[in-house]
Amino acid sequence: KGITPVRIAHRLGQHSDDLRTKPLIIYLNDSTTGITKSILNKPPLELNLLNRTKGSAYYEDDILITEPFDFSSKNYFPISSQHNLLKRVIFPQNFDKSERFNLSDEQQEYLLSAMHTVPRKAGYDPKTYYDGYCKFFIYGDTKENIPEYLEIYNKVGFAYGTLTDCAYIKDTEKNIDFLLTATILVNKDGIFNDDAYEYDEIGIPFLAQLGREIYQQELKRK
């Protein structure tokens, strides 16, 4: 779709570096329609990037390794690529057919609804999963409900001390809208995989304030 650079080299979670793709059973209306074959993939090439190692140490299997963490075999999806992908999701009509995702109107509507829906409207306890739980921009550092007139279509990520939000924000009352993508690393001790990241103390408040600042700029530009 013309989105570069992107490199998806491994799964998420346990055994993410397993090169064998397990077979998938495909169901339709409780009936099996097909089974895919197991595939043995090639090992990923090292990323040709600067600063592929970060920090001063990391944990592996509960053992502290006192050397920088190597990200050269990890997935690579920079925020420039995320931002360009979001544009195609929100404004497909602005792109050539070859650059659009092959989604039906129903699929497009479902995707946007999933990106916009806050946890309480999906049946989750709002005391635990408040509106800003996965809406870092503007509301990430508050447990207030997001007003109905402010629509946030986004996808967040957090791993290895890095927080990312990629969002389309639309105020239907003030008649303003904007796209915003940002990422921040919060790993004060320089140790990866120790679960001691400053997400709540630094990362989320920073992204929330960034969203508010850009929102205010858009109000002034209007």
Protein language model features and the residues they cover:
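Structured C-terminal helix/loop/strand segments within mature extracytoplasmic catalytic/sensor domains
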Residues: 71-79, 83-222
